[in-house]
Amino acid sequence: MFYVFLANGFEECEALAPVDILRRADIAVKTVGVGGKTIIGSHGISVNCDTDNLNLTTDGLEGIILPGGMPGTLNLEKDSTVQKFIDYSACNNLLICAICAAPSILGHKNLLNGKTATCFPGFEKELLGATLSPDPVVRDGNIITAYGAGAAFDFGFEILSAVKGKDFSDNLRKQMKYK
């Protein structure tokens, strides 16, 4: 199971492209509203989340996904439940996936020390201890980062590759007619 944490001001495609890809692959994914079930994205799109952040469990958790966007990233970072699940995922070597501005949250928690990572331009200084990459998506151990909305599908396919393997991910890519 993956939790995709959504806070008001999140970048819609960065959250929903990975959800779509993982669900097509029959991977359990729950969208989690930070502060309620209905969350408004940075472009005014309202999303009714599967659950809120009050009744979550770590049972069966495979990883977490943190979309970027502003002020969504700031809202994620200040939420204690999001922080708890980042810590749990890090301690248990689960996948921690962050895109756009959201890798800054991982940098602030010193989770990128000695890792290679990418982010939206302008947030590089927040990736404390990381070796910066210009690549759209970077996977280093249990951490997957991506640089923005234009990489949302590649981000989703990289998460899928980490869970079910590259061949499985490539086959779904072909089925979806994605490069």
Model-derived segments and spans:
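Conserved hydrolase catalytic core segment
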Residues: 111-113
